Amino acid sequence: MKPSAECCSPKFWLVLAVLAVSGSKARSQKSAPSIGIAVILVGTSDEVAIKDAHEKDDFHHLSVVPRVELVAMNETDPKSIITRICDLMSDRKIQGVVLADDTDQEAIAQILDFISAQTLTPILGIHGGSSMIMADKDESSMFFQFGPSIEQQASVMLNIMEEYDWYIFSIVTTYFPGYQDFVNKIRSTIENSFVGWELEEVLLLDMSLDDGDSKIQNQLKKLQSPIILLYCTKEEATYIFEVANSVGLTGYGYTWIVPSLVAGDTDTVPSEFPTGLISVSYDEWDYGLPARVRDGIAIITTAASDMLSEHSFIPEPKSSCYNTHEKRIYQSNMLNRYLINVTFEGRNLSFSEDGYQMHPKLVIILLNKERKWERVGKWKDKSLQMKYYVWPRMCPETEEQEDDHLSIVTLEEAPFVIVESVDPLSGTCMRNTVPCQKRIISENKTDEEPGYIKKCCKGFCIDILKKISKSVKFTYDLYLVTNGKHGKKINGTWNGMIGEVVMKRAYMAVGSLTINEERSEVVDFSVPFIETGISVMVSRSNGTVSPSAFLEPFSADVWVMMFVMLLIVSAVAVFVFEYFSPVGYNRCLADGREPGGPSFTIGKAIWLLWGLVFNNSVPVQNPKGTTSKIMVSVWAFFAVIFLASYTANLAAFMIQEEYVDQVSGLSDKKFQRPNDFSPPFRFGTVPNGSTERNIRNNYAEMHAYMGKFNQRGVDDALLSLKTGKLDAFIYDAAVLNYMAGRDEGCKLVTIGSGKVFASTGYGIAIQKDSGWKRQVDLAILQLFGDGEMEELEALWLTGICHNEKNEVMSSQLDIDNMAGVFYMLGAAMALSLITFICEHLFYWQFRHCFMGVCSGKPGMVFSISRGIYSCIHGVAIEERQSVMNSPTATMNNTHSNILRLLRTAKNMANLSGVNGSPQSALDFIRRESSVYDISEHRRSFTHSDCKSYNNPPCEENLFSDYISEVERTFGNLQLKDSNVYQDHYHHHHRPHSIGSTSSIDGLYDCDNPPFTTQPRSISKKPLDIGLPSSKHSQLSDLYGKFSFKSDRYSGHDDLIRSDVSDISTHTVTYGNIEGNAAKRRKQQYKDSLKKRPASAKSRREFDEIELAYRRRPPRSPDHKRYFRDKEGLRDFYLDQFRTKENSPHWEHVDLTDIYKERSDDFKRDSVSGGGPCTNRSHLKHGTGDKHGVVGGVPAPWEKNLTNVDWEDRSGGNFCRSCPSKLHNYSSTVAGQNSGRQACIRCEACKKAGNLYDISEDNSLQELDQPAAPVAVSSNASTTKYPQSPTNSKAQKKNRNKLRRQHSYDTFVDLQKEEAALAPRSVSLKDKGRFMDGSPYAHMFEMPAGESSFANKSSVTTAGHHHNNPGSGYMLSKSLYPDRVTQNPFIPTFGDDQCLLHGSKSYFFRQPTVAGASKTRPDFRALVTNKPVVSALHGAVPGRFQKDICIGNQSNPCVPNNKNPRAFNGSSNGHVYEKLSSIESDV
């Protein structure tokens, strides 16, 4: 190889000398290692530029200094290149090569790859063929290229298509190496992209065949896509384009995109290449040859420097191209790692494993009509920047073809055109949007390189454009105008969208473009697709709330009707119904009504109804009558509707009312003379539009004034309106209406609800005299005809604030709206009036018939209830006797007389004289075989022969005092009622209830079976009548009184009593809280505390009654009271005492003298302050006397009592309230204090007797000062006691101490200390609750040892079952206890007064059976001979002793202290609250 003349020139050697001198100087100055690098320039290259590039001091900072060898050569054949490089290695000891050529031969790259692999020398191809794409490099090669890889170029080609929305394409390749990589890269990219790519064809052309063009033509004819990607060499591309041109694939409508391999040298362009060819090439404009040489030297030097820094050596120079040693291989591989990762001057110059740059500088070039390559885009940092926002469709000059691809300009203005950014993930536009280009104006860019970014457009006009393009069948490129707005002629030149169309840069202009005459002169407009004009927008002003806004929900008529119905109608109606109701407050139906009690006034009625309107937020008093309750309930429903309607409608009137400053139009004074207002009225518009033109042509002064207030855009104008910088904005009506509808907070409105001035329309601007106008007009008219235009208007032009006031604001509720509520109140009043009339008719006329009084048979209500019960339980109804003849019948079943009867019963229990004497009662208790009905405590006596006892005759005035009490109570009763009472008592000795006997008398009735069931009696208020005897009569004193206790409340002797009345307001509070405790606490106790029991009368009332009777002077026993039908009523009471056939006479004992003396003593005791307990001291004289013994001998009526019994009875060591024995009281003390021993209580009774911290047994406070008797007589009536001052004072002090029943608190505490039995109530659902430990356990099982009452002797032998807790009972068909002593539903005589006095009302007689009293406490065995000891204690003139009950006396049944303690007398242990009215307090 001969050196060229250029290489031997003096200039060349001068350069080498300079380099040598500089290198030696550097080595002398700094002993740094150097590396030899050969720079080979093939072809024509600028040596001076290269010299300037590597002579700079840019590499002095590196640890290795480059030693550059500049070589120029012209030969490009492989042999010359190989020889020259090998000579340099052997002569110059080079360690790297940088090669640049100006050819398009990709073979040079292949030669360099071969040399590098053989010599293990790094070679860099920086330009020309050496930098072209090369596939399948040698693995040991260190050949690197300044150029993009195949994959990188394929990615850039896809980005170009995506930029212009070219999604449909095909691929054409040859068998040139790397085609498979190219196709695979395209396929993998489109498969993993969000863009909707569509690859139609992939053609592989075999260029080695010599069969002509026919085969290639046939293959190219398959292509139908407008975009074609070509991969081949430059020579192959020349032939392919020639064939493609012959088949029409290079004309208008087809775009070819090729890599840099096809473009090659940009200075030579083959004639076969079509105009508009796009190529991806290495940047030749910004990255020239000198910069590449410099970077090549820097890459090798930097890599060697990094290697020296880490390993302290650099590769040794190569002396020959042959015989490579292993050490050289190791050093070269190590240097290769540093060459791949190089950063120089902050630029990343790294290479990939394939030897291509990681970040190449690429450009997109276009072959223009001048047949020159034009740079139209740049790829930098994986971002594409294109010059043309619409791709120029370039075609040959000779081709005349109709253009169906249009360039369209638009303007951003919502809602007609809305511009958005592309999707950040896919980089494309989403659905229902159209790609549009937006130009970026920058001062740093030249006019030749404008920047554009891709945007997405949508809106009303865009949807119209899409529909028109489908109908007319054309494609388009959309871009946004930048030089102006809609278009205005300035100095004879149009700008904006009109200017783009006039300059023919766009075929059409679509947007909010108003049609006017000036624009129509230069462009053609389509028919208007929307009507518009000029409108004015203002800001709403904040109003104030009216003071009467709270009244606005209802009209004045509704408010008037509200108060009329409340004050006049509803309140008055409730008051009248309540006042005249049978159970109202002001109806004095009972004498016991408290004076000054509550009354339901008209004011309370108004207050009640007014409180209901506001949800009972104030304390009110509720009515009691049924009619008034109905009226109040309906009013409550009315109040709910009224208040809910008011509240719901109030929100619409309480919000701020907004007012709009009205402007009549453009001729308004505020527009024509704005300075006349203070402050001046400010208004403006957007310049360069049809609105400004219209104002300028019609209102010159207005146009001159508004110039300083004009806005740059609609958004700026809206902001100025909200901030107060602008008072009115004049613009297109369509745009303003949309903005007003979409305004946040709806603060902006158009005057006159969108009033339009200078009406016109929006149209599409088309180039003048274009053939597209007619087709576009027809397409728009078709949209109107199909209704699609209305759909688009509803979609885009309707805002949320449109008609807002009509939707939110509610109208006033007039009388028609509220008429239904007032109709409801009227109907309620009518119904209440009918109910009121029916209530009175039933109460005064039909009530007795329903209760069976009229027919004498069971009432309808009773029959229905008993029939249902019988069907369920299989109990037959036996109507053998009239229900009114039953002993359980009542004298009057009305609630109105209950309180009167209760008071009468108490008065009768406290009567003086004959009625208070126990003598007559004792006459009946004979020693013969008579049976006293102790179970029901009635005067029902029979002999063993089932014959009734014949009462002896009585005196005429026997019941005068008693009848006077009855006359005072029942004086107004009709005659038929009296007959009912008399018939009732005639059958009293043989009582029968429906289906069974209700007395022990039935057990000895020869006509009845020995044992029958006892179904529940009628639910009435039975009234059993007992008659007191005369003072001198031989008849017994009738103990029984008017009992108001029904069958359901009579119970076992040992058990706690249930309630005493059937009154619905009575609520039993059971003392036993065992069992289902949770249920009782939540239901029974809770309900009992809410309701008001009948027996809970005010203690003050009882105290007044008792004190009144104490103050009454004693009446003469002969005092007569005359009343209607007195003789018949006397016969009614005397009938029971007349002697009957076959009955033994009773022995009469005259105790007149005893009671006479007692009467005198009582008078003296009452004067001296003797209490009710001290008068019992007359019965005992000294310590040697027995209790109840006259002269040391038992009284005649106590002949059968044994001494043991008398000791137990009279010992005085038992509590007066319970059978507990008092161990701390001896017989001696008891004998000395016999007058007080009846009042002694045990500690438990003392504790339970406290009521609100008031001691019940105040008489025990003076027990430490006993008063012994001073005289002893054989007759009890002559006993005298000294009245010491202390004792008299104590008696006087204790005289007014009124005893109280146990309160709820003490009762519960008592139950906690001493457990009581289970409650007396039971129901089917509580069956399981009472299976154990309950008197009702016998209802579900039959013990084997139960004996029946089939024989007569069972009366005296079966009595031990009565008090034996472990005894069982025979199972019967009834749900109630079999024995009358166990039945809690049988009424008793005298229980009413015992309820009031707290005493026990049972008379006991000691049985004649020997040892019976000593062996067991047989209750029935005690019937015959038990004396009424308390009768002697209570012999008080003028009234009964209120402690006449035997519960205060000694009980022969010695109790077990472990058993439950009995309560005082017949006190049932319940809590009775005050009863202020009789009817149900529901």
UniProtKB/Swiss-Prot annotation:
Job of this protein: Component of N-methyl-D-aspartate (NMDA) receptors (NMDARs) that function as heterotetrameric, ligand-gated cation channels with high calcium permeability and voltage-dependent block by Mg(2+). Participates in synaptic plasticity for learning and memory formation by contributing to the long-term depression (LTD) of hippocampus membrane currents. Channel activation requires binding of the neurotransmitter L-glutamate to the GluN2 subunit, glycine or D-serine binding to the GluN1 subunit, plus membrane depolarization to eliminate channel inhibition by Mg(2+).
Sequence segments annotated as region (Disordered): 1074-1097, 1162-1194, 1266-1301
Cysteine pairs bridged by disulfides in the record: 86-321, 429-456, 436-457, 746-801
Consequence of gene disruption: Mutant pups are born at the expected Mendelian rate and appear grossly normal, but lack suckling behavior. As a consequence, all die shortly after birth, except when they are fed manually via a soft tube that delivers milk directly into the stomach. While mutant neonate brain structures are grossly normal, the mutant brain stem trigeminal complex lacks the neural repeating units called barrelettes that correspond to whisker-associated nerve fibers. Primary afferent nerve fibers from whiskers fail to show normal clustering in the region where barrelette structures form in wild-type.
Site feature location: Functional determinant of NMDA receptors: 615
Extent of motif PDZ-binding: 1480-1482
Descriptive protein name: Glutamate receptor ionotropic, NMDA 2B
One MF term in the entry's GO annotations: glutamate-gated calcium ion channel activity
Tissue specificity remark: Detected in brain (at protein level). Detected throughout the brain, and in brain stem trigeminal nucleus. Detected in forebrain.
Primary subcellular site in the record, as a coarse category: membrane
PANTHER family membership: IONOTROPIC GLUTAMATE RECEPTOR
Phosphoserine modifications at: 882, 886, 917, 920, 1058, 1061, 1064, 1143, 1255, 1259, 1303
Pore-forming: annotated span: 604-623
SMART domains to which the protein is assigned, alphabetical: Lig_chan-Glu_bd, PBPe
Assembly and oligomerization: Heterotetramer. Forms heterotetrameric channels composed of two GluN1/zeta subunits (GRIN1), and two identical GluN2/epsilon subunits (GRIN2A, GRIN2B, GRIN2C or GRIN2D) or GluN3 subunits (GRIN3A or GRIN3B) (in vitro). Can also form heterotetrameric channels that contain at least two GluN1 subunits and at least two different GluN2 subunits (or a combination of one GluN2 and one GluN3 subunits) (in vitro). In vivo, the subunit composition may depend on the expression levels of the different subunits. Found in a complex with GRIN1, GRIN3A and PPP2CB. Interacts with MAGI3.
Binding site for Zn(2+): 127, 284
Localization in the cell: Cell membrane; Postsynaptic cell membrane; Cell projection, Dendrite; Late endosome
Gene3D superfamilies the UniProt entry points to: 3.40.50.2300, Periplasmic binding protein-like II (3.40.190.10)
